[in-house]
Amino acid sequence: MQGSKNKYAYEIIKAKFFDNIKNIDDFIKKINKGFNFNNRGIEKTKGDIFEIFCEAYLKTNPEYQVKEVYPQGYVPIYIRNKLKLNFQDKGYDGVYETINGELNTYQSKFRSKDEQLTWQGKNGLSSFIGVSEKAHIRHLLATSNKV
């Protein structure tokens, strides 16, 4: 299996962020300690790390039968056209194709477990639902218990 296509993956992996993580609790504890890289700020970096995690999770979990994962910015034009996704790459974090050829969009949200995800506004879910209308499945991957 090839590595992450995420544009920040190489540097985050090189910094050994994912080393010595045995389960999701270890991952959440480590990410919450704050890891700032490339002057993006701690909150942006948390999101970057969670997006890389989600890409790997989708690729390796047999339940989803994923053929390929395309993070935002790496979705081939023919797939964006088929799903009618905007070319500004807004509203979704990526697309994954199943071994059956189904195209699914995904959105990654790293939040505290008790933080309510919002429907509208900045970082709301409404734009994800709106831009993903043509996807077979809209997949939300979140760390919050309050969706």
What are the residue ranges of the model-derived segments?
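Interdomain/boundary linker segments immediately adjacent to catalytic/signaling cores
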Residues: 1-62, 77
